[in-house]
């Protein structure tokens, strides 16, 4: 009898040890530094906008953080050390996702005004491919999101980072997105640094405070009403809802 107990005990300890090793191979919390590269020539087609763009300023590089744990994720811009004359041409929006309640709070920077949107996590139909690449030391698999006939996005995610999160609030893949790009390469995000940390509660929180909060449907209606008749309104609408 004691022999069976001993064997069972050894087996149990062995299984727990294996589970611990497997679990340690996956990252449940951390901080990712992203770089966003925007090609303004590809983003803006309006002739008036193009006149402001030249070889010296057509590429904008900006930084973002993705801070996450098992239950939430926050994607937010890194403040610029100094602004430049082209900074208004690219917006830094923030996204807080509660992975348990499946809710997302988005703060959009629209012409210097902050708009707060609370809605469910986006449900996107991804096509996962066999294509792989390494980003910041992690093997990533390529996935494709076909939003409509004119908008296709590519994501590279790793299952080594457990939370389903990524740049600009993108989620829905079996792991964390370390690379995201538009089909024409006009906007590209890549992870430059990955830190395995346990973030503080305040570091991963976004609060609307007393600001007015709308849902996605109400935001669409507001933008169409306020800017839909302007010559640049459609382009702004398309750019904004590329991510929403």
Language-model features, listed with the residues they occupy:
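Bacterial Sec-dependent N-terminal signal peptides
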Residues: 1-32, 242-244
């Amino acid at each position: 009898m004691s022999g069976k107990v001993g064997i069972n005990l050894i087996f149990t300890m062995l299984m727990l040890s294996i589970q611990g090793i497997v679990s340690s191979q996956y990252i449940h919390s951390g901080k990712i530094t992203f770089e966003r590269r925007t090609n303004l020539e590809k983003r803006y087609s309006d002739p008036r906008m193009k006149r402001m763009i030249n070889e010296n300023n057509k590429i904008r590089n900006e930084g973002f953080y993705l801070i996450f744990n098992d239950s939430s994720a926050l994607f937010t811009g890194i403040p610029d050390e100094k602004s430049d004359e082209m900074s208004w041409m690219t917006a830094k929006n923030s996204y807080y996702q509660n992975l348990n309640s499946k809710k997302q709070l988005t703060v959009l920077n629209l012409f210097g005004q902050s708009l707060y949107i609370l809605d469910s996590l986006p449900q996107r139909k991804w096509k996962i491919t066999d294509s792989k690449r390494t980003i910041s030391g992690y093997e990533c698999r390529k996935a494709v999101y076909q939003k409509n006939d004119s908008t296709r996005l590519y994501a590279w995610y790793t299952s080594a980072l457990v939370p389903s999160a990524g740049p600009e609030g993108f989620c829905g893949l079996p792991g964390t997105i370390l690379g995201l790009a538009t089909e024409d390469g006009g906007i590209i995000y890549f992870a430059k640094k990955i830190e395995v940390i346990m973030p503080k509660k305040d570091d991963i929180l976004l609060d609307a405070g007393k600001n007015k909060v709308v849902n996605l449907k109400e935001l669409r209606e507001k933008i169409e009403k306020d800017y839909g008749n302007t010559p640049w309104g459609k382009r702004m609408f398309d750019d904004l809802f590329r991510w929403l």
